Every structure is written in C-alpha cells, then in structure tokens.
C-alpha cells in the first residue's frame, strides 16, 4: 500500500517540484495550501504596496497552487491558520521588536505552524503518513544512533536548515524534504519540463507568509513611533534623529538618514528606554564585534549525547544569521538549553533576538535565541 504524503503547496516553484518528485517516487500525494495572513483583518495597511491589488497575493498563490495540483492530477486541500499565526508567531514578533530585539518569524512559523499545526492536521485529519515541504534541507535516519538527522542541502546558497533548527525528532520522523539533492536551476528546469505554471515564478521574500513590505512602515501598523537621538557611540555627539529605536537592527546601515557624513555609519547599540540609537563609523567597526554570546531556549533536534562526548563543553560550528559562513564555536553549558557560545573569529553584528544555529559537519544540531552579546 502506498504511503500518503501531504505536501505544503504554497504556489511557488519549490513546493510544486517537491510534489512532482514524490509522485515519481511512488507516494500517494495530496496538496495542502495554508492561508496564514489576512491583510484586512490584521490591519496590514502602511507599507503594503499590494493592498489595492484586485487579487491579493495570498489568493493568487492559492490559484497557482490549484493549477499545479490540477496539472499533477492531485487533490488540493485548503486550511486557514490566520488566528494561529497571529497568536504563535506575530504577537511574539511584535513583542520582541518593542523590546528592541530582532526576532526571526520564519523560524517561529516553521516551529508553530508548518511543522505543528499543519503537520497535525495532515496526520490526524487527512490521514497522511508524512508531510513534505519545498525546503532546501534533508532528513536521514542514522541506524547507529537511531536518530533522525536534519542535513544541509546540496545547494549551499539556498540551504534552509537555519530556519528549521527548532524541529524535533518527532517532527523530523514525519517529514520528507525531496529537494535536498537539487540546486535551484535544476528545480526550475524540472518545473518547466513538466509544464508547471510556477516554473518562472519569482521566489517569495520578506516576512514568512506576509511577503514584501516597506518594513518600518509595516511595523508602524503595530508599534507607535518613539522618536529620539542618533548618537556617535565613540564621541557621544548627537548626529541626527530617528522615529523609533525598535525599527533598527544591529549592523544596519541604510535608513539612518545621516546626510553630509564623510563615511557610512552602522547601528552599534540601542537603548530603548532612553530612545537612543548608538552608531559607529565604517572606519571603526570594533563596536560591532563580539567574542561571546549567551544563547537561550536551545532546541536540540536530536539526542546530543549520541554525537558529542561531553555535552557540558564542546566545539562545533554555528551560524548567527542566515547565509553567514559557519563560524567555529565553543559551547559551555550554563543550564538546560542555555549555553555560553564563544568564538575566536571576527564576527560582526551578532544580534539579540536572532537565532544561533549549530552544526556538526552537515548535520544541523539545533538552535536557540541569542540573548546577550559580549
């Protein structure tokens, strides 16, 4: 009897090809389209250039997913997770920005929506054996350790294990990633050969399930402006004004509106209570550099003791942001799911609220939230 897979059909090329490949591999395949954002209900007005479109982007994505499903000869289900996305992803996202931190909504969306709400619906209601997504990542079962290992994609530029670092053994055991061994041009080629409407569709960017927005204006829908000074961290000189320190992230250069300066300036630190953004010149980036970070709420995607001799103190590599080259790090355990992470390499703009994700060669071990940078 064929195993049943529910594919998260998003209306993009990656999930379209994932569905096609699984059909070719002999699975019984059905699609499930998620609607996670409602611009009207969620007051998504400022910064939304698509608000006056005749067909909203989410609805166009559904129509594209439906056309792909029809072309492949599979059933397409549809489900609404707008309320769940708001509660589990967006409220945290806004709360963190108000604190002056920079959260990663894509990681939260994977943790709480795609691999929780979606997975449970697929398994329990649609009676699937597995779910599948168009992510660039892989899962393999290690017979020796008896662990499901999440591994990097062959296309290193597209690898998305960073965003999947919160997945658990249970979730990995029920997930297929058909695109692990393919690069983007190959995927577009397969889509074109199969006559899929998504073959030339541009990749989605912006906030997970929300899309591209003028970011500061978008946040103004949910956070009130709190103007203050832009201060040179070295000289304490006031260089300009800002409309809200929470709108800026560590390492940011664009959008400071510091005219007449001899060189670019970067956001080096923020004081939310005093409404101050501290900046440093490009010629002195020492204020952006760090050697240690405290990482909290770490999720280990596998049983770490099967891979690391001493889990109290060990070395591996890490990424502190998406597409950053791996950095060699030393981890010292503070308490359960909290480690001090030290690195000798010069790492710029490690940012509180973002995720630190840990690797052992091609295996993603898991990740946690950067809480304090030293």
Curated annotation (Swiss-Prot):
One Gene Ontology CC term in the entry: cytoplasm
InterPro entries per UniProt: MnmA-like, MnmA-like_C, MnmA-like_central, MnmA-like_central_sf, Rossmann-like_a/b/a_fold
Interaction with target base in tRNA as annotated region, ranges: 104-106
Protein origin, superkingdom: Bacteria
Keywords tagged on the record: ATP-binding, Cytoplasm, Disulfide bond, Nucleotide-binding, RNA-binding, Transferase, tRNA processing, tRNA-binding
Residues reported to bind ATP: 8-15, 34, 134
Classification via Pfam families: tRNA_Me_trans, tRNA_Me_trans_C, tRNA_Me_trans_M
Region (Interaction with tRNA): 158-160, 321-322
Annotated S-S bridges: 109-208
RNA-binding among keywords: yes
Enzyme Commission number, as recorded: 2.8.1.13
GO BP term, example: tRNA wobble position uridine thiolation
Task of the protein: Catalyzes the 2-thiolation of uridine at the wobble position (U34) of tRNA, leading to the formation of s(2)U34.
Protein name, entry field: tRNA-specific 2-thiouridylase MnmA
């Amino acid at each position: 009897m064929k195993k049943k897979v529910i594919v998260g059909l998003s209306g993009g090329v990656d999930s379209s090809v994932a569905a096609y490949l699984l059909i070719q591999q002999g699975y019984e395949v059905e699609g499930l389209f998620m609607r996670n954002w409602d611009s009207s209900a969620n007051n998504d007005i400022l910064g939304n250039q698509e608000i006056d479109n005749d067909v909203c982007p989410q609805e166009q994505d559904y129509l594209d997913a439906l056309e792909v499903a029809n072309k492949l000869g599979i059933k397409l289900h549809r489900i609404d997770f707008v309320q769940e996305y708001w509660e589990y992803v967006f409220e945290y996202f806004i709360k963190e920005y108000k604190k002056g931190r920079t959260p990663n909504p894509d990681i939260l969306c994977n943790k709480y929506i795609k691999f929780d709400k979606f997975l449970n619906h697929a398994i329990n209601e649609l009676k699937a054996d597995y779910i599948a997504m168009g992510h660039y990542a892989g899962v393999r079962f290690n017979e020796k350790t008896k662990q499901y290992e999440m591994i990097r994609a062959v296309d290193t530029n597209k690898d998305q294990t960073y965003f999947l670092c919160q997945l658990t053994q249970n979730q990995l055991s029920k997930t297929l990633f058909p695109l692990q061994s393919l690069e983007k041009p190959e995927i577009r080629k397969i889509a074109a050969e199969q006559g899929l409407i998504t073959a030339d569709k541009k990749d989605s960017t912006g906030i997970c399930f929300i899309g591209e927005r003028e970011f500061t204006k978008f946040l103004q829908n949910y956070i009130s402006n709190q103007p203050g000074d832009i201060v040179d961290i070295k000289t304490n000189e006031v260089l300009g004004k800002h409309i809200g320190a929470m709108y800026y992230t560590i390492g940011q250069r664009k959008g400071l509106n510091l005219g007449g300066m001899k060189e670019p300036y970067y956001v080096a630190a923020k004081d939310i209570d005093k409404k101050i953004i501290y900046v440093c010149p490009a010629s002195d980036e020492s204020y952006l550099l760090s050697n240690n970070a405290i990482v909290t709420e770490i999720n280990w995607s596998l049983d770490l003791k099967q891979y690391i001799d001493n889990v109290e103190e060990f070395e591996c590599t890490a990424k502190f942001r998406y597409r950053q080259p791996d950095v060699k790090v030393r981890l010292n355990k503070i308490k359960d799911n909290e480690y001090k992470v030290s690195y000798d390499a010069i790492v710029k703009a490690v940012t509180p609220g973002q995720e630190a994700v840990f690797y052992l060669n091609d295996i993603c071990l898991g990740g946690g939230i950067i809480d304090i940078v030293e």
